[in-house]
């Protein structure tokens, strides 16, 4: 069964974008705003559940030698994360804000790694993962994103792949958003402040029925 939250009472919101786009900052700002109106769970993938830290370390640490190993670990992480964190929160009447979800798998594994689109697109439905009502894409030019990543230091396995890889992923995200405009909100980032970006996201979420 797919859990899809409708009607604005409870929403499952996912935040997407290439590394360095500012998802974590926006997740924090959104959860602060939502917590003033009710219960909210802030989480992330990979690793957003008890026991997930080891999986996160494996997929981001660069130790895996085969792209399918990477994919299967992401799906394992998502299955446990959904069962242990996302679904219980939604059933308890809480909003859920998640940094990265199944669209990350499509963007990174399909556009980034060249894996087949159709089987992976249907994996979430086949597994019965909760379906987000709204997905926000923080759209940023890869050159700017990588410059931000470089300032942070110690890039992970994906951040180390370079500009061409990030360009493919950015293209993938834009294609996914264009194919499902009802679910997606696209926020252009560029050199804008976090407050400006949040204000645009907030307008988009209100337009999708989220009381903010």
Task: Set out the residue ranges of the language-model regions.
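NTP-dependent small-molecule kinase module
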Residues: 2-9, 31, 143-212
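Walker A (P-loop) ATP-phosphate-binding motif of ABC ATPase nucleotide-binding domains
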Residues: 12
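Hydrophobic anchor at the beta1->P-loop junction of P-loop NTPases
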Residues: 15
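P-loop (Walker A) phosphate-binding loop of NTP-binding proteins
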Residues: 18
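Conserved lysine of the Walker
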Residues: 23
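Hydrophobic positions on the alpha1 helix immediately C-terminal to the Walker A/P-loop
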Residues: 26
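ATP-dependent small-molecule kinase phosphotransfer cores
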Residues: 39-126
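A glycine- and Lys/Arg-enriched "phosphate-lid" helix/loop adjacent to the NTP-binding pocket
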Residues: 104-171
């Amino acid at each position: 069964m797919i859990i899809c939250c409708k009607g604005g009472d409870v929403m499952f919101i996912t935040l997407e974008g290439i590394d360095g786009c500012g998802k974590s900052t926006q997740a924090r700002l959104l959860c602060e705003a939502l917590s003033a109106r009710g219960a909210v769970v802030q989480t992330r993938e990979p690793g957003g559940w008890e026991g997930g830290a080891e999986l996160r370390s494996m997929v981001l640490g660069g130790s895996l030698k085969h792209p399918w190993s990477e994919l299967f670990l992401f799906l394992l992480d998502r299955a446990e994360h959904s069962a242990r964190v996302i679904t219980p929160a939604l059933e308890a009447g809480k909003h859920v804000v998640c940094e990265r979800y199944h669209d990350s798998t499509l963007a990174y594994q399909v556009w980034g790694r060249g894996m087949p689109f159709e089987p992976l697109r249907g994996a979430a439905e086949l597994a019965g993962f909760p379906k987000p009502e709204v997905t926000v894409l923080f759209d940023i030019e890869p050159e700017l994103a990588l410059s931000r990543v470089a300032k942070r230091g110690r890039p992970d396995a994906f951040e180390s792949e370079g500009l061409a890889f990030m360009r493919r992923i950015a293209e993938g995200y834009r294609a996914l958003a264009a194919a499902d405009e009802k679910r997606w909100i696209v926020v252009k980032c560029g050199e804008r402040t976090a407050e400006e970006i949040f204000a645009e996201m907030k307008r988009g979420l209100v337009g999708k029925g989220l009381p903010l």
